[in-house]
């Protein structure tokens, strides 16, 4: 994510992996203001809709909390319909002059679908069950794909938690806006 304003808080890694009817969203704990680490233990993942939806955000913190509130409202209006709630949020994001200025992205998931809601108001479903956003997202995505797509016996026995933790730690080693304080939320079948 390009940092347009060094007075805003940016930078994170959010990773979502879906496997065998289980899904985890993980986020690191670092909050940066410009080039300064302001906090190491921020919680960027949370549960919504009576714990049936998990979500993580990247981008400007205040903007992300605005989107969380809007998404919660859409989920209340369309209970059990995550895709519809996200599409409705995306419509608002595109149409509303205030929302269009928000600098954040989200990954949301329930028991059946994982979605990325982009800063442009797009709703995308990852093809392979792996999604990542934020400054370290590409590193976490590459590591997670490598771990999930490996065909050796060891990789077949790796837990979802192990894959997520390993991928997030690799991202933290590379991305200066990501740390190793990983917080996860999981929905199990």
UniProtKB/Swiss-Prot annotation:
One GO biological process term: proteolysis involved in protein catabolic process
Subunit architecture: A double ring-shaped homohexamer of HslV is capped on each side by a ring-shaped HslU homohexamer. The assembly of the HslU/HslV complex is dependent on binding of ATP.
PROSITE patterns: PROTEASOME_BETA_2
Enzyme class, first EC level, given as a word: hydrolase
GO MF entries: metal ion binding; threonine-type endopeptidase activity
Keyword hit for RNA-binding: no
One Gene Ontology term, aspect cellular component: HslUV protease complex
Pfam families reported for this sequence: Proteasome (PF00227)
Species of the source: Ehrlichia ruminantium (strain Gardel)
Catalytic-site annotation from UniProt: 12
Main location: cytoplasm
Protein name: ATP-dependent protease subunit HslV
EC number(s) per entry: 3.4.25.2
Catalyses which reaction(s): ATP-dependent cleavage of peptide bonds with broad specificity
